[in-house]
Amino acid sequence: WIGLVGSEMCIRDSSITADRYFYIVGRFLLGLYFLLPGLAKVFLFQDNWDVVVLREVPFPTFSLSLVAIAQIFFGTMLMVGKYVYMGALVLAVVTLLINFYIHDFWNMAEDANQAHETQNFVKNLGIFAGLLVLSKRSTQT
């Protein structure tokens, strides 16, 4: 009986350890998901600015700069485990704004580009959901 209790404890402890590792790896990958595009916005500013102007995003230079800063800063913070709650919520808002301004498939002709933007839109909804879960989880650790 004691051995069984001891075995359960080991299983429970390893489950907690695995949960912690999954949280850290998931948080790191979500951070990387935002850091890399943020850096791309800086180093390929003109290309990204052209897209932002084409999609009629308000205040294109300011908006693009702000999104790049948010993605770089909060993406990095997610990766290192700082400001996770705030970072996840800010990046969730950024993700929704990108979805509605950049991946607006409903404003496109029915072709391969529309299908691609629909896929990006749905993918971003999954990222948005992950950020919401991360924000909740970060308040519990």
Where are these regions (language model features)?
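Membrane-interface extramembranous regions
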Residues: R12-F73, V80-T141
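Single conserved hydrophobic/aromatic residue that forms the stacking wall/gate
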Residues: W1-D13
